């Protein structure tokens, strides 16, 4: 199923429900840095997020150093943000919350 790029108004409405996420200037990606208590918590978050990403068939761009995980989401095929990006961001928020973040 081809995902359609979201309109700016829809993106802004979705962003209102995502604390700490930043929208890039072109409104083509969102990003957030998650900070955990330690590496084990960060890796647990990444594992849970990876399982959800596989189920969605939508994969993040991310970078991990010790307790920090930097995440950027967009849909390359659509040339911007789609519903999948916000589904994955919300799943990541739940995974982080389970770890006290």
Swiss-Prot record:
GO BP: tetrahydrobiopterin biosynthetic process
EC numbers on record: 4.2.1.96
UniProt-listed InterPro entries: PCD_sf (IPR036428), Pterin_deHydtase (IPR001533)
GO MF annotation terms: 4-alpha-hydroxytetrahydrobiopterin dehydratase activity
Domain of life: Bacteria
Catalytic activity: (4aS,6R)-4a-hydroxy-L-erythro-5,6,7,8-tetrahydrobiopterin = (6R)-L-erythro-6,7-dihydrobiopterin + H2O
Keywords: Lyase
Leading EC class: lyase
PANTHER family linked: PTERIN-4-ALPHA-CARBINOLAMINE DEHYDRATASE (PTHR12599:SF0)
Family: Belongs to the pterin-4-alpha-carbinolamine dehydratase family.
NCBIfam families attached to this UniProt entry: PRK00823.1-2, PRK00823.1-3
Protein's name according to its UniProt entry: Putative pterin-4-alpha-carbinolamine dehydratase
């Amino acid at each position: 199923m081809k995902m359609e790029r979201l309109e700016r108004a829809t993106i802004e409405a979705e962003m209102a429900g995502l604390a700490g996420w930043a929208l890039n200037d072109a409104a083509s990606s969102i990003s957030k840095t998650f900070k955990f208590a330690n590496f084990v918590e960060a890796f647990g978050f990444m594992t849970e997020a990876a399982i959800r990403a596989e189920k969605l068939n939508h994969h993040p761009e991310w970078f991990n150093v010790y307790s920090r995980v930097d995440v950027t989401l967009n849909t390359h095929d659509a040339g911007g943000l789609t519903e999948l990006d916000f589904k994955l961001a919300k799943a990541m928020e739940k995974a982080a919350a389970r770890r006290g973040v």
